[in-house]
Amino acid sequence: VQNNISFNAKKGVTRGIHAEPWDKYISIATGEIFGAWVDLRPGESFGQVYTTRLDPSKAIYVPRGVGNSFQALEDGTAYTYLVNAHWSLEQKKTYTFVNLADPELNIPWPIPLEESERSEADLHHPMLKDAKPMAPRRTMVTGCNGQLGHAIRDYVETHGLQGFEFNDIDTFDFSDPTQYDQFDWSLYGTIINAGAYTAVDKAETDEGRP
């Protein structure tokens, strides 16, 4: 969907660690990097680290929720990353971060971080113990004020499930094509439609019992 290029004039430029709500395909146009990736998705693999060097002969796929970082090892390194979602302010709210210098991660940077070039923002990212896991994609429930919608909401609240949003016709009429643009659909992984025209009481009438 969107291809980005980061040109690094001097070796030692170090960026990260950023987990974003999209997949990335990373390649190097010129130069070489040391890459470090940290799993920031909730679960048993949270905090696991993978490192490798990339040059123009190699590329790597980074799934959604895995923190990405790199260090330029040559002057004039061009780092490219193809992503499968467009940037948006709503997407940015879901980013999560961890500090490049976290001793728990113990990333073996080829150029010591104190000799590297880092941004002010990257210097102040939290350590892993304070990092917020990347939330999974959201689930939207439409028709939430009907019988089925209420049952779904009760189940979600009883079981403490996270990431659910509830809409009824007054906030999202899915029969109206003009209303779809109010949502960034890349943030959602599941849609549950609990809305329909029903007349349950007619089942108790002669008309409802042919």
Language model segments and positions:
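Non-catalytic, conserved peripheral segments adjacent to functional cores
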Residues: 1-54, 74-78, 83-137
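Conserved SET/PR-domain catalytic core that frames the SAM/AdoMet-binding pocket
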Residues: 54-73
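Glycine/Thr-rich phosphate-binding loops of Rossmann-like dinucleotide-binding domains
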Residues: 70, 149, 200-201
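N-terminal Rossmann NAD(P)H-binding glycine-rich loop of SDR-like oxidoreductase domains
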Residues: 138-159
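SDR active-site strand-loop-helix element
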Residues: 142, 167, 191-195
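Adenosine-cofactor binding site in Rossmann-like domains, unifying the SAM/SAH pocket
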Residues: 163-182
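NAD(P)H-binding glycine-rich loop region in Rossmannoid oxidoreductase-like domains
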Residues: 178-210
